[in-house]
Amino acid sequence: MLESVVVKELQTIEEIEEVRQLEREIWASECVPVHQIVSSINNGGLVLGAYLRNELIGFNYGNAGFVDGESYLYSHMLGIKREFRELGVGELIKHRQKEIAGEMGYAKSKWTFDPLEARNGYLNFTKLRTYSKMYLPNYYGELNDPFNKLLPSDRILVEWNINDGDYLRWDSKIEELKEEAVEIILWSLSVVGLPMLDKDYTFDSNISFIKDAYLLPVPMSFQKIKVESPSLAEDWRYKTRTIFQTLFSQGYAVVHLAQKNEHVGHYLFV
């Protein structure tokens, strides 16, 4: 299927309206205004559409970013039509985005995602070979779309160097680091079969971490947990938030997500 997917830049009002329709279908919430997207496209932004036999099945919307003297492409939104998810369409779009961003003169792309969405973590870190060093608690405030409602909108900031330079520091050592890594907190299955973190574990945010690598479990089906056990979803959010913030503050970065089984994946901190 992927060989038939065409990813191209979108610029016309008609193309943008098509993107907004798909955005509404995916998130069931307010869409980015046309005038804002047009303004972004004409000022360093980039909108890509993935088409299968002339049907828009995915898109990516990014705008120019500039912080602390550094310019980059900020990839604000990646959306894939439900029936085409987990087929590699998102990865295809992101690689095309990286290629065009380089042609536009960008050296880096950044974006955010919910770290408890492990499948997104697998795409971002393991497939795309990005890294993250920053945790953003309740980044967007309260969100009411089906994916984000009922919990703080925590995010981690992903960085993707166009020339892959930073990642090369870890790339050849990933397997070795995974073998050596210490698991920060244990997990188990609840009586109804949902993954849960150790109830008796108290994380000390004042402890100094000295190992070369650590592993942090995250659920593979966080949306299911949110529906079936909101209190368990909250537990995952607040416990992992503290761990992320502590390790990032001590200079660690997330560079990989390992899928060990159907219940959890493990972020690799180095």
Spans of features found by a protein language model:
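A conserved beta-strand-loop-helix scaffold within acyl/acetyltransferase catalytic domains
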Residues: 3-82, 136, 259-260
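Short loop segments at secondary-structure junctions
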Residues: 53-54, 83, 161-166
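Conserved GNAT acetyl-CoA-binding A-motif
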Residues: 101-114
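Residue-level recognition of the GNAT/N-acetyltransferase active site
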Residues: 81-83, 114, 219
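Conserved acetyl-CoA-binding loop-helix of GNAT-fold acetyltransferases
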Residues: 80, 86-101, 120, 236-239
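Intrinsically disordered, low-complexity, positively biased terminal segments
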Residues: 104, 132-270
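Conserved active-site alpha-helix within GNAT-family acetyltransferase domains
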Residues: 115-134, 143-146
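A conserved beta-turn-beta hairpin within the catalytic core of GNAT-like acetyltransferases
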Residues: 65-75, 85, 107, 209-216
